[in-house]
Amino acid sequence: MEKALHRISSMNAALPDISLTDAAPGRRPLEWVGMQGIDLPVVVAEPGCRRDVHARADVQVDLPAPQVKGIHMSRLYGLLDGLADGEALSPAGLQRMLRAMVDSHRDCETRSARVRLRFDLLARRTALVTEGLAGWKAYPVRLDATLAGDAFALRAQVTVVYSSTCPCSAALSRHWIEQAFLTAFGHEARVEPTAVAAWLKRHAMAATPHSQRSEAVVSVALPADGTTLGLLDLIDRVEQALGTPVQTAVKRADEQAFAVLNGGNLMFVEDAARRVQAALEDRHASPRVRVRHLESLHPHDAVAWAAPLREGADAC
């Protein structure tokens, strides 16, 4: 085995590299070239979250030189692998890596590089009421870092799952119950509280509003000079704006508290998008919001987008 490896190593010294020696057919510049879906262990430093996460990375550089046949993907891979050295992800670290990628491709006249990281941030979440009860919730995260010349840009996208109850459906349900109550007691001049309580116990849920699991996908620009990513803070702000994030471990008291939260947080998809956008505008740069309610009434979803007033409302 050792002899075979030594022989292969000796042969490698003379291996051809056609990306350097062969001419590019067509002689056209390429906007981006690189790799997608690279498995990578990274460290994310967020309070109350698991530090070690499994990420999927996409990495590319531009190829403006029309005569160059191909880039050096192994160089990109090696530099990307440096993110797995145990240092927590940060804007400065991502910028250094992208700068090194550009520098490694000077022979390709490369001026720009970008990386996208996808992973789940696993956060510990406590129950609404029951003391000592908690569970883990995974939040999908996407980081997009780009270096174009000397300009570095970094955006973070998080997905938050919540419950939404339809205001229109709630109003129709209340109307039905109101009419049923009048049918039962409208002819009586005086009604005993115990009779009302007994009626409510049996009929208060004669009509229920439809609710559904929903998701908010939020994207914000992060400062290039930031020391941390601030992902959990962003997630917390979104959940607080919505008021009804899905729960992990619950007992009956927690489930009841969640029902109360839903009853006090009726929202259309438009309401959800506006709430989240308003909660982020004063704290985060260029927030963009996309919400989706997976309707239980319909076989289709309700969706809404929001962006800063000075920008177009494109998708996250």
UniProtKB/Swiss-Prot annotation:
NCBIfam families: PRK13674.1-1
Keyword Hydrolase: yes
Substrates-to-products reaction catalysed: GTP + H2O = 7,8-dihydroneopterin 3'-triphosphate + formate + H(+)
InterPro entries named in the record: GTP_cyclohydrolase_FolE2, GTP_cyclohydrolase_FolE2/MptA
Protein name per UniProt: GTP cyclohydrolase FolE2 2
Top EC class for this record: hydrolase
Source superkingdom: Bacteria
UniProt entry keywords in alphabetical sequence: Hydrolase
Annotated pathway: Cofactor biosynthesis; 7,8-dihydroneopterin triphosphate biosynthesis; 7,8-dihydroneopterin triphosphate from GTP: step 1/1
GO molecular function, one term: GTP cyclohydrolase I activity
Entry's family note: Belongs to the GTP cyclohydrolase IV family.
Species, as recorded: Burkholderia cenocepacia (strain HI2424)
GO aspect biological process, one term: tetrahydrofolate biosynthetic process
Role description: Converts GTP to 7,8-dihydroneopterin triphosphate.
EC number(s) recorded for this UniProt protein: 3.5.4.16
Site (May be catalytically important) residue list: 166
One Pfam family per UniProt: GCHY-1
